[in-house]
């Protein structure tokens, strides 16, 4: 009697089909988790600047992301370097900026770029401070290819 050695062609094709189906399901889920993780990472990196901003404002200064402006007096207020460069060494943040409104601090922004996933590149995450010192988080996804609200942290608002 002849004994079978190995797998038949149909068995191998079934295994390959199962692997293909699993990969088709897993890849989009993986990309979603990566996008969420990258947004959360920048959320916490940028959120760490809130303490420095509060300290600078408490001393009557204006935060800046340009180290060359540190100590410069502008409109009778001293600019102080925030510790976050315009072009940080982050592999996710492309640019960082400070938003002023009538020479008053309003927000700190970070734009996704560099090694961020393509669907979130161009999105801008901002921490906005009101006159009472309350902070809110905003994500402007208008320049991003695909950035659904499910990617954003619970405390952020998408605009």
Curated annotation (Swiss-Prot):
Keywords: Disulfide bond, Fimbrium, Membrane, Methylation, Transmembrane, Transmembrane helix. One of its GO terms (cellular component) is pilus. The chain crosses the membrane at residues 7-29. Its main location: other. This is Fimbrial protein EcpB. Coiled coil: none annotated. The modification N-methylphenylalanine is found at residue 7. Residues 1-6 form a propeptide. The keyword Transmembrane applies. It is a single-pass membrane protein. InterPro entries: N_methyl_site, Pilin, Pilin-like, T4P/T2SS_Core. Gene3D superfamilies: Glycoprotein, Type 4 Pilin. One of its GO terms (biological process) is cell adhesion. The keyword Zinc-finger does not apply.
